Design a protein with these regions (language model features):
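Aromatic-rich peripheral "rim/lid" segments of glycoside hydrolase catalytic domains that contact
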Residues: 253-347, 361, 366, 375
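Extracellular glycoside hydrolase catalytic/binding regions
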Residues: 126-130, 134-273, 284-292
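Active-site mouth of glycoside hydrolases
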Residues: 1-2, 7-9, 15-18, 25, ...
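Extracytoplasmic
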Residues: 325-513
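Short loop/turn segments at strand-loop or loop-helix junctions that form parts
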Residues: 52-54, 215, 352
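Residues that line or immediately flank small-molecule/substrate-binding pockets and catalytic motifs
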Residues: 53-55, 149, 189, 273, ...
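Conserved Rossmann-like nucleotide-binding pocket used by diverse enzymes
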Residues: 89-90, 242, 348
Length: 513
């Protein structure tokens, strides 16, 4: 199940009355657009390190804590819109009081993880969580609480602090369950929500209603092996897995491969984020343009250029907020087909369905030389003329994409499958190369789409620049062969009956496109 992220944080929601009305008009417009996209969940982020958002520093007389009713009223509005448009809300405590991660995203003082050392800050977080339970224990539209974002991520104290994080989770759930026995808690691992080994026991002993929130971007290899540890933990503890944060820059192949693996293992995923500046190359739902004079702000902040006057800077910021209006944004449609596997998109041939048994069959007796999906017994080969750097993904400089230059080699008796979710009529093609004729059988949902011979096909080595990564060469050009036309979603199975071919992409094009 695909969702995306909505940030609910101090700089946007607590500027002034004018900006409050602007932002909430934009958010409500977004929910209408979101409904059209047929997405099912919105993740609402809170930077509670800015404690005045929900909990006020000064305690009211005879109270343990005082709460900002304006902020809760805003959240109430958002939850009402969620109900109106039938979109579940995952409430994400993105930044705990005093900071929990050691990285700037939690807005903590000096980027330290003071939550674990400061008893008062941890208690304030418990109080805030209890207040959320009191207010929202009966709000069915809240699908889960995501707690807490990327804890203990950049620190030499990870081993020392992890037991304190475990205590925080256990005590938080214990106290919250006295008020709310219904809602799911999604708990984050350490090191950018990737290390989950300490979820080795029951964290919700009375109600067993918890799961793991994992984060992954393009640095993570899109294969089952990357998820094996957390999937095994979830099975052992009988809990759910949710990819609480993911996305990436121009990573179409990575996204359509990784997200299908998650779907096969019944894990939802949340796209960061809902809106990005035009040209950022991020997998957002909407893009916006910045004001013409925005460079005056960034030149001053980043390069030490002349400082705009207060009035001038405020006018630029006001214009920036106006640019965020949904009706001034552009749908970032280049990503949607790859995320949902609907419309016009390509699947890398090496991005075949992951589950064993009927989804694929390789017959090689050696691990493939590309070092990817080693357990599937396929020959994955680098395209002609491509030689990966010896250090691979550990090489200095920008992340390289050797998998973009890997082809799936299928010989007689081998097959691979691909899930297609387009519901209308579309054409299925493949790009491939083969030294000789190849006899193949292609079926979708068990019905034969093509059975016959594909002719010999060449491979054109290119020195062109990669379409998405300026520091890399583009993949080689392969011949394209049309397999047939289909109506409706299904699982496409490509099997070689005789001969051998190397496949580059599965190409889906809606009829007339």
């Amino acid at each position: 199940m695909l969702s995306c992220s909505l940030l609910f944080s101090d700089p946007f929601f607590l500027l002034n009355t004018l900006h409050y009305s602007l932002i909430f008009r934009f958010v409500k417009q977004f929910f209408k657009k979101y409904y059209v996209f047929s997405l099912k969940i919105v993740k609402i982020y809170f930077l509670t390190q800015k404690t005045r958002i929900f909990i006020i520093e000064e305690k009211a007389q005879n109270q343990k804590a005082s709460y900002n009713e304006d902020s809760f009223a805003m959240l109430d509005d958002v939850l009402d819109w969620c109900e109106t448009y039938q979109v579940y809300a995952v409430v994400d405590f993105h930044a705990a009081t005093a900071g929990q991660s050691g990285i700037p995203c939690d807005d903590g003082m000096d980027n330290g993880q003071h939550l674990y050392d400061d008893e008062e800050s941890m208690e304030r977080m418990f109080l805030l969580m209890e207040e959320f339970m009191r207010r929202y224990k009966d709000r069915w539209i809240i699908g889960a609480y995501d707690c807490i974002n990327e804890p203990i991520s950049m620190t030499p104290r990870r081993e020392e602090l992890t037991p304190k994080l475990v205590y925080f989770y256990e005590e938080m759930i214990r106290r919250c369950r006295k008020i709310d026995q219904k809602h799911l808690f999604l708990l984050n691992g350490t090191q950018f929500s990737s290390l989950t080994y300490f979820f080795d026991h029951e964290f919700d002993p009375e109600y067993h209603n918890w799961g793991i929130s994992l984060h992954a971007y393009e640095m993570v290899v899109p294969e089952v092996a990357s998820l094996a540890s957390v999937l095994r933990t979830c099975r052992e503890q009988k809990i759910c897995l949710w990819m609480g944060e993911t996305g990436g820059r121009n990573e179409h192949a990575w996204q359509t491969t990784m997200y299908e693996i998650l779907a096969e293992y019944h894990a939802g995923y949340n796209l960061w984020c809902w809106k990005t500046v035009e040209g950022a190359g991020c997998a957002s739902i909407l893009n916006f343009n910045v004001p013409d004079e925005w460079h005056l702000i960034t030149d001053y902040a980043i390069n030490g250029a002349a400082k705009p006057s207060y009035e001038h800077a405020q006018a630029i910021w006001d214009s920036y907020l106006e640019c965020l209006a949904v009706d001034k944004c552009k749908e970032n449609t280049q990503y949607h087909p790859y995320l949902l596997r609907e419309g016009n998109f390509e699947i890398p041939a090496i991005g075949y369905n992951a589950l064993p048994m009927d989804s694929h069959r390789g017959l090689s007796d050696l691990p493939n030389a590309a070092g990817y999906r080693l357990y599937d017994r396929f020959e994955l080969v680098y395209e002609k003329g491509y030689h990966p750097e010896p250090a691979g993904f550990a090489a200095p400089g920008p992340i390289k994409h050797p998998r973009d230059h890997v082809q799936l080699q299928l010989g007689a008796g081998e097959y691979a499958s691909y899930t297609i979710r387009e519901k209308e009529t579309y054409t299925v093609s493949v790009t491939y190369c083969a030294d000789k004729e190849v006899k193949v059988q292609v079926a979708i949902q068990g019905e034969t789409l093509f059975e016959g011979v594909m002719p010999p096909a060449g491979e054109k080595v290119t020195s062109d620049v990669h379409p998405y990564f300026a520091y890399e060469t583009a993949p080689n050009t392969l011949e394209r062969f049309t397999l047939g036309t289909v109506t409706g979603e299904g699982i496409l199975k490509i099997e070689v009956l005789d001969g051998c071919a190397r496949f580059g992409q599965i190409v889906i094009r809606k009829s007339g496109k």
